Regions:
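Conserved beta-strand edge residues that scaffold enzyme active sites
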Residues: 41-42, 67, 144
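Glycine-rich phosphate/adenosyl-contacting loop at the front of the ribokinase-like
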Residues: 1-59
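Short coil/turn connectors at secondary-structure junctions
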Residues: 31-33, 71, 82-84, 106-107
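Short Asp/Glu-rich motifs
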Residues: 46-47, 71-73, 147
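Ribokinase/PfkB-type carbohydrate-kinase core domain
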Residues: 52, 83-150
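Short hydrophobic segments within beta-strands
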Residues: 37-39, 76, 112-113
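A glycine-rich helix N-cap at a beta->alpha junction
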Residues: 51-69, 77-79
Length: 150
């Protein structure tokens, strides 16, 4: 997702964002082995977000590109206290998240954003992924995988 931030009615910044995205970027910058699972449109925004992940040390190999989709946008309107009021735009002609399951090793950690926890449309994919993950969960080495709708 690309966040376009407005202050006093004018755009002041455009940055990739989202809660899971921000967390995985922090891990990548800290040198932690981290991957991001998501979707993007085949557009300049999608290219920018994927490159931003890579530039910050995050594996973006599991970001699925959909030629018939546009990458999601968020408009954040800041008030005088810098609290944001958001408007979200998403244009996916398909209803379900599609992704190739990445290699998961014993001890890896998976974090899902709230979209995956609440959206019944993608729940079957999340349940299947968690079943796969639970089959191999065992030791203490750690990598991080994030799934998001960004």
């Amino acid at each position: 997702m690309l966040d376009i931030i407005f202050k006093n009615g004018k755009p002041i910044e455009a940055v990739p964002g989202g809660s899971s995205f921000n967390a995985v970027i922090s891990l990548g910058r800290a040198g932690v082995n981290a991957s991001f699972i998501s979707e993007a449109g085949n557009d300049r925004i999608g290219e920018y977000v994927i490159q931003f992940l890579r530039d910050n040390g995050v594996n973006a190999d599991n970001v699925s590109i959909f030629p018939e989709s546009k990458s999601p946008l968020s408009l954040a309107f800041l008030d005088e206290n810098n609290n944001a009021d958001y408007i979200f735009y998403k244009d996916h002609p398909h209803d379900q998240l599609e992704f190739a399951t990445p290699e998961i090793n014993p001890g890896d950690i998976v974090l899902f954003g709230s979209f995956f926890a609440l959206n019944p449309v993608v729940r079957p994919q999340v349940a299947g992924f968690l079943e796969y993950f639970n089959l191999i969960l065992a030791s203490m080495s750690a990598s991080f995988f994030f799934a998001s709708s960004a």
